[in-house]
Amino acid sequence: MITIALPKGALLSDSIALFKQIGLDFTAFLDSSNRQLQISDPTNTAKALLVRAQDVPVYVEYGQAQLGIVGYDVLLEKTPKVANLADLKFGACRMSVAVPAKSPYRSSIELPPNGRVASKFVHCAEDYFRRLDIPVEIIPLYGSVELGPITGMSDAIVDLVSTGRTLRENGLVEIDVLFESTARLIAHPLSYRLNLDHLDQWVNKLRQINLKPVA
């Protein structure tokens, strides 16, 4: 029996729909009365773990799950040792730099030297500004990062943006995009290489749903 790590939040519904297309039913996770964090498919072919998105690659890397679905942003932030198998083409968003609309900055390179940037994606933010050779202080925030520039604690933020509505409602504007992010299918490398629990069979079924393989 294979174990699949599914992410709580925005990607869950589409993830469950995807697996249902290949005969694995985890819709019980969508029941508002559900409190279980681990369930088995009715055919007893596979089980799924319901975990925080950031924890999906951890369960996969350590072999507690053979497959998982996670945003590309999490993979870049956490850099886990997992096999990135396919772009699932849902959950599209982007990692962006945003500043107050009234600020004079319209590009990352215009930010002041040693300026402050608030983000929950510390690694992604540090890597981005290092590549630009711009010295900034990254302030880790794990709640509403929009409050960083609103309160004057930071000059900018680095955060995921989908529609941009939250930014607009808080008087912020995007000035640069670090990368685009979508949901990805990941696997435990050794399990995938050895085809444990007929893992290849499930991956191939998923790939037949016109998924884009990752180079």
Curated annotation (Swiss-Prot):
Pfam families: HisG. It is found in: Cytoplasm. Gene3D superfamilies: Periplasmic binding protein-like II (3.40.190.10). Its EC number is 2.4.2.17. It catalyses: 1-(5-phospho-beta-D-ribosyl)-ATP + diphosphate = 5-phospho-alpha-D-ribose 1-diphosphate + ATP. Keywords: Amino-acid biosynthesis, ATP-binding, Cytoplasm, Glycosyltransferase, Histidine biosynthesis, Nucleotide-binding, Transferase. InterPro entries: ATP_PRibTrfase_cat, ATP_PRibTrfase_CS, ATP_PRibTrfase_HisG, ATP_PRibTrfase_HisG_short. Its main location: cytoplasm. One of its GO terms (biological process) is L-histidine biosynthetic process. Lacks the C-terminal regulatory region which is replaced by HisZ. Catalyzes the condensation of ATP and 5-phosphoribose 1-diphosphate to form N'-(5'-phosphoribosyl)-ATP (PR-ATP). Has a crucial role in the pathway because the rate of histidine biosynthesis seems to be controlled primarily by regulation of HisG enzymatic activity. Heteromultimer composed of HisG and HisZ subunits. Belongs to the ATP phosphoribosyltransferase family. Short subfamily. PANTHER family: ATP PHOSPHORIBOSYLTRANSFERASE (PTHR21403:SF8), ATP PHOSPHORIBOSYLTRANSFERASE ATP-PRTASE (PTHR21403). This is ATP phosphoribosyltransferase. It comes from Gloeothece citriformis (strain PCC 7424). The lineage of its organism: Bacteria, Bacillati, Cyanobacteriota, Cyanophyceae, Oscillatoriophycideae.
